[in-house]
Amino acid sequence: MSKAFNATPLFDAHKAFVRLPMGMAMLDEYPDSKQFVHRICETIPDAREDFLHTQAFLKSYSRKSEATYRGYRNEVERLLLWAWTVANKSVIQLKRPDLEAYFDFVHGPAPAWVGISVQDRFKIIGGESRQNKNWRPFAAKIAKEDRAEALSEGHSVETSRDGH
């Protein structure tokens, strides 16, 4: 299992997502995510289909509500990122043991996958939506004053399953 977090967010906030084109063209506005997905597709060819099916799924639910979109986005994005960077497989290739490993991971993610606070996925830099290097798929859920001390002492932190 990979120790470092070596992925980028795939899908932006609801307001941005609903205005984007469907297909791989969506990534044109997110150069870091585009580069990440293309790099993954070199070793996992079905990753492109994973991305497109997930995008279509999110698009179909984005019209219901922002909260529904955010909840679904968080869960499916975590699955895609885990499948591609930890299991090194397309979601299409996952079997029961893989899913059991994923569920274990979600309940105790690698520390590199856990941020110390909820962060925006992207930042506008030079007019482009660039990856926020502080974003992680999971966020610590501890008191602010205890967070720095726990991390500086090398302790793990409780993760939040709440959307961000």
Where on the chain are the PLM-derived regions?
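N-terminal core-binding DNA-recognition domain of tyrosine recombinases/integrases
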Residues: 53-67, 77-164
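Basic/aromatic DNA-contact patch characteristic of tyrosine site-specific recombinases
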Residues: 1-77, 81, 90, 101-104, ...
